[in-house]
Amino acid sequence: MRGRDEDTGEFRGASRSQQRREALEIFDLGEKLVALTPAQLAKLPVPESLIPHIEESKRITSHIAHKRQLAFLAKHMRREDDETLDAIRDALDANSDTARREVAAIHRVERWRERLLAEGDVALAELLEAYPAADRQQLRQLVRNAIHERAKNKPPRAYRELFQVLRDLSQKPGLESGDAGLEDEESASENDE
């Protein structure tokens, strides 16, 4: 199908530069697949014919041999149809969006923890407004202990425990007002910056 059209004299198919760009995109996709854990890989719509090549690429550690194996994997991936490769790309993008949301949730919890340590009862009142089911006494005790540990240069056990309690609190299902409170906190901190 490639070559010149006999009637018009124009080239058919993609240019060599376009073919090179597509090959590099597939090579990069192969690198991303090799970097995934087996559990993450199982969630993706990867054809069974590619799994052994991906596993072999993971096994090889020598730099040049690993690169050669990735090129071999890319060669097999180019044989797959575009719909399959697009489905893999879409699934990888969805996974990265999920990971980004999880990281954002952790950052929100960290901001709450820092606010509790810096502002004390003012931040605690806002947190309890957002999460009415939260245990005020436990949170206040953890904040006090974390401040005390920081002042005495002790290991941050209460600091970590406060994070765990806040994370568990933010992950409880059915706390719609709590989620709104965290979102309000996130947007307020972004507006301050």
Swiss-Prot record:
A cellular component annotation (GO) from this entry: cytosol
Any Gene Ontology biological process: assembly of large subunit precursor of preribosome
Protein name: Dual-action ribosomal maturation protein DarP
Residues covered by region (Disordered): 1-20, 170-193
Organism, as annotated: Xanthomonas campestris pv. campestris (strain ATCC 33913 / DSM 3586 / NCPPB 528 / LMG 568 / P 25)
Localization of this protein: Cytoplasm
Known function: Member of a network of 50S ribosomal subunit biogenesis factors which assembles along the 30S-50S interface, preventing incorrect 23S rRNA structures from forming. Promotes peptidyl transferase center (PTC) maturation.
UniProtKB keywords: Cytoplasm, Ribosome biogenesis, RNA-binding, rRNA-binding
Main location class: cytoplasm
One function term, GO molecular function aspect: rRNA binding
UniProt xrefs under PANTHER family: UPF0307 PROTEIN YJGA (PTHR38101:SF1)
Biased amino acid composition, Acidic residues: 181-193
Pfam families: DarP (PF04751)
